[in-house]
Amino acid sequence: MLPFIFSDTRIAPAGVRAIGAAMVEGGFTKTRIVLQQWNRNFRPSAMRLDGRAPDLFMISSMAIHGQRAKEMIADARRIDPSSQPLILVGGPKAIYEPWDLLGAGGAPAADVAITGEEYVLLNLLEVLLAERAGKEPLRQVFLRVRDCGGLDQVPGLMYARTDARQAVQELVDTGPQRLLNDLDELPHPVHGFGLLERPSRRAGLAPGPLPASQVARHSPTASLVLTFGCRFGCHYCPIPAYNQRQYRVKSGQRIADEMRRLHDEFGHRLFFGADDNFFNDPSRTLKIVDHLARTRIAGGPLHKRIFWGTEATVHDTLRMTDHLPLVRKAGLRAIWLGVEDMTATLINKGQSVPGTMRAFSLLQSAGILPMPMMMHHDSQPLLSRRDAHGLLNQVYLLRKAGAITLQVLMISPAPGSRSYEETFTSGLVLQGAGRMKVEAHMLDGNYVIASKLAKPWRKQFNILLAYLYFYNPLQLLLSMIRLRSTLYPAGPTAQMVGMAGLGHTVRRTLGWAMALLLGKIRRTGIWPQSSVPIRQLASAPRLPAIDYRKLFSGHLTPTMSESTAEFPQLSRLGVGSTPTKLEFPEVTPEVTP
């Protein structure tokens, strides 16, 4: 659906690739990344590497794919107990609601949830391999180490303690992760792209990963982590808490190296920065773009070879006014702006109608395409007569200012945000309407599932009308007429893609809109929570960001082009020569039950 139509199958997600890259740099070379959007028939019970089931099976999932993740866990539990892999879960679902994947409700459970980043996983594996005896199955090692309390000093985990019948008695939370301070120490993303499973309809695995020559054809856009964190504290956003109010960046040298290697080894020319707010700190941003502007790839300037985009806020874009030409010279061609509400009625991040219009004008003058992202909310009408408060009024202004694409989502409760529980207790959250009930995949912002209005169906139709007002045959025709005056021939393409996406969005959401219109609306005041006790370890306090080179006693050796992570425990146990087999399925947008 909009706004992710078609991109969901054309971008291999950065998160699961980062885990795969970390495993490769840690010595686990026999790793496979299975993307659900490419391999919809994949079943863990059918996976084989070198003729046997892997020792370690990991699932990365967003909240909207929670049901699919549970199905994966259940299928993996069908493997014979003697060869059953250790099952780990990660991703946003595991970070904010780990208990839901650990058997708190009686369903088949994962063994442990990783509630942090790559190095939490590597720290866990180092602990397990230090206790491994010979070729002892990794899951048996985990159970033994877990029962003796050996996991309690690894921040960023949640695991279950069970009785003799394997019934969950309590969940143990080892506390917040210790953040990686220097993002240059992250594993190089080039390794993750070399682990992708070939797209197919098979239930099992191919003999080998997707050839390098075919990677860019299936994933033409490469998403890269450039920065983490945002200085704004929006009540509906979980990002500040996850990043522990810190802002972390990669250096321009590291980013240039990643783009160069991905371009040279896989043929990537399109990149998307997985940033929360790329312009968050102007001084750090300038260091990055200054280096990229001086970088050469394949014999020419980077901006002649590479097309990349990222996300930022309107206010921070205005703070970069004098430097936007340099940003463009660094190769930035498009920026997705968190406009939310131009009048700052929903949230005030320093944006205003004049400021937003000026930011769009400055970006266009610099040769950068502005891509607005909006949030619809209860207090915003569809149309207003005397001001710019209405949704269609703002869509009109954004289109007039040069917006090429449009994103309109309804504000929804987000686990991990400050307002999450209050949204439920205040009676805003819908449990169902008519014969339909709210399911996990409806938490993506396309469905109105939280509203104080007696007629929430109006908001559902407002979103569709806003998209129809922006994407339609008339606008396609006008974009073709204005083609010579625009920066890029992106207008007609965006209109055609947008109209196709609108068709899918109508097909997927119209039933819910009609249920809201005709059915009885049911609300809930209880937010999702664990049905079993969660014990927070006193020995796992909130810790500051650290240098992981010190944590691993100097065994992490980051070299800009050949970054490696060496763990003496792995080599001593022979993991380098006979690596533990890993499996990484990824549950991704638009893959719903």
Set out the residue ranges of the language-model regions.
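Glycine-rich beta-alpha loop elements in corrinoid/cobalamin-binding modules
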Residues: G15, A22, K30-L180, G416
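Catalytic cores of alpha/beta
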Residues: P98-G105, D322-H323, P381-R399
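Short helix-capping segments at alpha-helix termini
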Residues: G26-F28, R78-Q84, P108, R294-K304, ...
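Radical SAM enzyme core and accessory elements
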Residues: L2-I5, L49-D55, E97, T162-R165, ...
